[in-house]
């Protein structure tokens, strides 16, 4: 039985070999005809049916290649349109764009602006790139210098201390106008009344000292002050009769001493403010001299000044401004002499970012000015910044303040020495003229207020009740 089986296996081996070879060839043909889409294998076909199947087989993978379900990370990074916040035109930059974040001028939300889309001009003025799709960036100067004063009128003289007037909202705009309209003499500083009309602060302050007659004063009025009632025609301009009729009335309403007369009293909270200065030491002089900065010791401008003594940049509201500084004649001589007998305190209504940097240049070692106070130390009364000397924590009987604006020391009029505003006069000697009187006050070693009151008689300039 076994022998017969062995013979059968030996005899069938060639036949089995042939069958295996045929099966391999047949499997190879079927494998070549398998579709890539996973369809069932079929026999080789010819004719119309074969052509249709070939067309289907060839188009299906092509659609998949055109719309792949996933892309590699490298392919996604090439498409920059997926990561840009604003559309760009033109060629793409070779290097990565630098971005800055700033508050939106409309609603205060933070937004990203590409600095490559704009060209920065001098003092923060920006020029839009015509090839950019980003929104233009707007800037506002604000008030880094001492703000101008808003005078009281009968409509708002009963305001409370610390309340803001409507004019404060357009304060920055008026400062910008002042800088743009700065003349050669540079003595025009505009203010804003409660109803938004612009008035010349400097013209009001200097007018009592003018000796050129009423015609020159009227010319100043017609140039700087718009009429309140008289209509304006292109042929006639402002009515001269109206200027004559209302000159004294305007002077009474917008007199700085009218402002002082009707300034509201300090609130309980303001009276109890914590002193901003440290206690005196043994080396501190007994008397304190408070000095204003702008138009008292220096004159600064954002417009380029050919005769500027120094210039420096200031970063304010994300914009860099170049500040040009003129020093008042005898500025350093005055400080060097007074610092030997007085505790010099600089008290300005300007922003700290500007005033502090300027003082670091003028007095880097703080040998002349011992302390510095800024706008945040002032009292805001209807948009006006007043320097209340109580914040010093010093004996007011031995404290003196020098300021070109009498309104600044409205709460301590007997401690204040007014000085003429300075802008560019190289022959000015007002600082030198004050030295003998200041030295005498120290020698007397008495209450300085009666002597200041008798010398400058500012109370006599207040309007009657």
From Swiss-Prot:
A biological process term (GO) from this entry: negative regulation of BMP signaling pathway
Gene3D superfamilies listed in its UniProt record: HAD superfamily/HAD-like
GO cellular component: nucleoplasm; nucleus
Keywords: Acetylation, Hydrolase, Phosphoprotein, Protein phosphatase
Modified residues (N6-acetyllysine): 26, 57
Broad enzyme group: hydrolase
Listed InterPro entries: Dullard_phosphatase (IPR011948), FCP1_dom (IPR004274), HAD-like_sf (IPR036412), HAD_sf (IPR023214), TIM50 (IPR050365)
Residues found modified as Phosphoserine: 28, 51, 85, 104, 134, 165
Modification Phosphothreonine occurs at: 86
Domain FCP1 homology intervals: 282-441
Presence of keyword Lyase: no
An example molecular function term from Gene Ontology annotations: phosphoprotein phosphatase activity
Superkingdom of this protein's organism: Eukaryota
Signal peptide residues on this chain, from the entry's feature table: none
Biased composition (Polar residues): 8-20
E.C. no: 3.1.3.-
Protein purpose: Probable phosphatase.
NCBIfam families noted in UniProt: HIF-SF_euk
Family listed: Belongs to the CTDSPL2 family.
Name of the molecule in the record: CTD small phosphatase-like protein 2
Gene expressing this chain: Ctdspl2
């Amino acid at each position: 039985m076994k022998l017969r089986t062995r013979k059968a296996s030996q005899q069938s081996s060639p036949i089995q070999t042939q069958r295996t070879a045929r099966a391999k060839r047949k499997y190879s043909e079927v494998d070549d005809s398998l579709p890539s889409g996973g369809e069932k294998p079929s026999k080789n076909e010819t004719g119309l049916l074969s052509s249709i199947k070939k067309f289907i087989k060839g188009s299906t993978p092509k659609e998949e290649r055109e719309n792949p379900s996933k892309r590699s990370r490298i392919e996604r990074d090439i498409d920059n349109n997926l990561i840009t916040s604003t559309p760009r035109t033109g060629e793409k930059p070779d290097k990565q764009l630098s971005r800055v974040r700033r508050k939106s001028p409309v609603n205060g939300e933070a937004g990203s602006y590409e600095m490559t889309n704009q060209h920065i001009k001098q003092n923060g003025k920006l020029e839009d790139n015509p090839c950019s799709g980003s929104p233009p960036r707007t800037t506002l100067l604000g008030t880094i210098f001492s703000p101008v004063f808003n005078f009281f009128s009968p409509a708002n003289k009963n305001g409370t201390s610390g309340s803001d007037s409507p004019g404060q909202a357009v304060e920055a705009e008026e400062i910008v106008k002042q800088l743009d309209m700065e003349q050669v003499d540079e003595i025009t500083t505009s203010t804003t009344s409660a109803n938004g009309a612009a008035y010349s602060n400097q013209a009001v302050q200097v007018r009592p000292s003018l000796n050129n007659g009423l015609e020159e004063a009227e010319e100043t009025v017609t140039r700087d002050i718009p009429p309140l009632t008289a209509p304006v025609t292109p042929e006639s301009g402002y009515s001269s009769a109206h200027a004559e009729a209302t000159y004294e009335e305007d002077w009474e309403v917008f007199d700085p001493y009218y402002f002082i007369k009707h300034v509201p009293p300090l609130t309980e909270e303001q009276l109890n403010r914590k002193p901003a200065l440290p206690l005196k030491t043994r080396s501190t002089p007994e008397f304190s001299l408070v000095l204003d900065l702008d138009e008292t010791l220096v004159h600064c401008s954002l417009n380029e000044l050919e005769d500027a003594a120094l210039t420096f940049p200031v970063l304010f509201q994300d914009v860099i401004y170049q500040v040009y500084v003129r020093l008042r004649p005898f500025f350093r001589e005055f400080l060097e002499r007074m610092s030997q007998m007085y505790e010099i305190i600089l008290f300005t209504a300007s922003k700290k970012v500007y005033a502090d940097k300027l003082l670091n240049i003028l007095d880097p070692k703080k040998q002349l000015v011992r302390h510095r106070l800024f706008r945040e130390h002032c009292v805001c009364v209807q948009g006006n910044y007043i320097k209340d000397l109580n914040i010093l924590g010093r004996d007011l009987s031995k404290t003196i303040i020098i300021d070109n604006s009498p309104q600044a020391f409205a709460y301590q009029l007997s401690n204040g020495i007014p000085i003429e505003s300075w802008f560019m006069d190289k022959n000015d000697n007002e600082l030198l003229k004050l030295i003998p009187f200041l030295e005498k006050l120290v020698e007397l070693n008495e209450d300085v207020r009666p002597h200041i009151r008798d010398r400058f008689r500012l109370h006599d300039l207040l309007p009657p009740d």
